[in-house]
A protein has these predicted regions:
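Catalytic donor/gating beta->alpha subdomain of glycosyltransferases that bind UDP-sugars
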Residues: 105, 112-136, 170-232
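Short aromatic/hydrophobic "clamp" motif used to bind/position activated sugar donors
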Residues: 84
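Short, acidic, metal-binding catalytic loop of nucleotide-sugar glycosyltransferases
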Residues: 20-29
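A conserved acidic beta->alpha catalytic loop
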Residues: 21, 36-45, 64, 91
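Acidic donor-binding/catalytic loop of UDP-sugar-dependent glycosyltransferases
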Residues: 42, 91-103
């Protein structure tokens, strides 16, 4: 048996598709726990409609938006299974992805498994090249670290873990998935990356949403002890990636890069100024359809 946990906040446009993408690949004895936190739209009614027709789905509501850490703890506390798969409320989990994650738990030393996020973004969008480059590079790093036995940074879009490896999640204003990996590692378990467990993720389509998403993640890294990602580390591999892009798209790529650097600066400010969860966790609206 497995438990699939889905934290969600104001995802009325896509939450039903997310849940259905999971239900099609789990067994009758498995369960899906959806935690709706402080929703002010029709997210809860959308979930309730699925609960009414599929007994595998359970809904837990929070009156206020308390962050992903709070929702994850509710999922862990209410999960009937030892293996928990977590995905977000605004993604599509591709067929067989869940099975490809959980097969790794045949090894008792494995405490966490990361899926493979696949960005969805129009080719003519300003951030197209930058988005594909960054996702590809992150995947390459995860695969390399797995081969070296050093992988620990799970992807919050799609991951799985043993409940005994991660009995609770500390409050974090951002990069919750990174904190999860640190705890699993501290508890003596290994983690791996599964490149064939695909999850479709809609990328931000405008500068405002791009900055909102990237800045909150960067703030989370700055708040994480010995955070794994820095501007210096990412700029080191930028020249190599640049020459994989057609020359006529370089201006668009560099423009996106400037916006990206601004998001780093904003993330640093949000972390150092100790801004609240709601101030850090801005919703990129263009990713919600």
């Amino acid at each position: 048996m497995i438990t699939v946990g889905i934290p969600t906040y104001n995802e009325e446009k896509v939450i039903a598709k997310t849940i259905e993408s999971v239900l099609g690949q789990i067994a009758a004895e498995d369960e899906v726990i959806v935690v709706a936190s402080g929703c002010t739209d029709n997210t809860v009614p959308e979930i309730e409609a699925i609960v009414a027709r599929d007994k595998r789905v359970r809904l837990i509501t929070e009156a206020e938006r308390n962050g992903k850490s709070s929702a994850l703890n509710l999922i862990i506390q209410n999960a009937s299974a030892d293996i928990i798969v977590q995905t977000d409320g605004d993604v599509i989990v591709e067929p067989d992805a869940v099975g490809r994650l959980i097969r790794h738990f045949n090894d008792p030393k494995i405490g966490g498994v990361s899926g493979h996020p696949v960005p969805v973004i129009p080719r003519n969008n300003l951030f197209y090249e930058w988005t594909l480059m960054s996702y590809r590079k992150i995947g390459d790093v995860r695969q390399q670290q797995t081969a070296q036995g050093k992988f620990w940074h799970l992807s919050g879009y799609l991951l799985a873990f043993r409940k005994k490896a991660l009995p609770s999640v500390p409050f974090a204003k951002g990069a919750v998935d990174a904190w999860m990996g640190r705890i699993i590692q501290k508890n003596g378990y290994h983690m791996v990356y599964e490149p064939n467990a695909d999850v479709l993720v809609k990328a931000p389509l405008n500068a405002k949403d791009f900055v909102a998403q990237k800045a909150r993640v960067r703030a989370g890294y700055y708040l994480l002890p010995n955070g794994p990602r820095t501007v210096r580390k990412e700029l080191l591999w930028l020249p190599r990636e640049l020459f994989k892009i057609p020359l006529n798209r370089w201006p668009r790529f560099f423009t996106a890069g400037i916006v990206y650097l601004y998001s780093w600066a904003k993330g640093w400010y949000l972390a150092k100024a100790n801004k609240s969860l709601k101030q850090i966790w801005k919703v990129p609206e263009s990713t919600k359809s």
